[in-house]
Regions:
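Non-globular targeting/processing and membrane-anchoring segments
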Residues: 171-187
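Bacterial N-terminal signal peptides
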Residues: 15-24
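N-terminal secretory signal peptides that target proteins for export/translocation
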Residues: 1-11
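Thiol/disulfide oxidoreductase modules built on the thioredoxin-like
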Residues: 108-112, 118-164
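N-terminal "domain-start" segment that seeds a small globular fold
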Residues: 25-48, 113-114
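Short active-site neighborhood of thiol/selenol oxidoreductases, capturing the structured segment around
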Residues: 47-66
């Protein structure tokens, strides 16, 4: 029994190592984003390269992904805020035959502001240097180069910081530290 437990632990560690190695060997920050052929919910074909010239937030998600549902309203809010500077592509890794469920998911989870696409797979996460976890987000500059990526759900402060950088906006100024009053010493 101990042998089986040790082997299971080693297999888990090996799987994690292989996943990390695969991410390291895939697209890295500064690399050109890989090609990605997509379809919108009406079936029209699109390519990621069609969006060169404008920064893109490429978010991979699925209808079965609970963290994806939780982050959808935040992504939609940020798309509305940055609509003139950044395009959000919400790319489902679900099979294309579940388009009605995809549309219902977007509506239910308040993702209406997002440009929704299909045609990606879990392998696409690897191609973009993401861990095999959902959701996964890639930040691509106007020249089509990857500038950042996040495996897992995004938190508001982290997303806002990355979007300011991607949109070329200055970040918040550090709060100046209050000066300590000079100590008076009586001699």
């Amino acid at each position: 029994m101990l042998y089986i437990g040790v082997m299971a632990t080693l297999r888990t560690k090996l799987t994690v190592f292989v996943a990390m190695l695969a991410c390291a060997l895939s697209a890295a920050a500064g690399d050109a984003a890989p090609s990605l052929d997509l379809r919108d919910l009406q079936g029209a074909k699109h390519a990621l390269a069609d969006y060169h010239g404008k920064p893109v937030v490429l978010n991979f998600w699925a209808t079965w992904c609970v963290p994806c549902a939780a982050e959808m309203p935040l992504l939609s809010e940020m798309q509305n805020r940055y609509k003139d500077k950044v395009l959000f592509l919400a790319v489902s890794v679900d099979d294309e035959d579940v388009k009605p469920e995809i549309a219902a998911f977007i509506k239910k989870h308040k993702g209406d502001a997002l440009t929704v696409m299909t045609g990606a797979s879990l392998d696409s996460l690897h191609d973009f240097g993401l861990a095999p976890a959902m959701p996964g987000t890639v930040f691509i500059d106007a020249e089509g180069k990857i500038v950042d990526r996040v495996s897992g759900a995004l938190k508001r402060p982290d997303l806002e910081q990355r979007l300011r950088k991607l949109a070329g906006e200055p970040g918040p100024s550090p709060t100046p530290k209050a000066k300590k009053p000079a100590s008076s010493s009586k001699k």
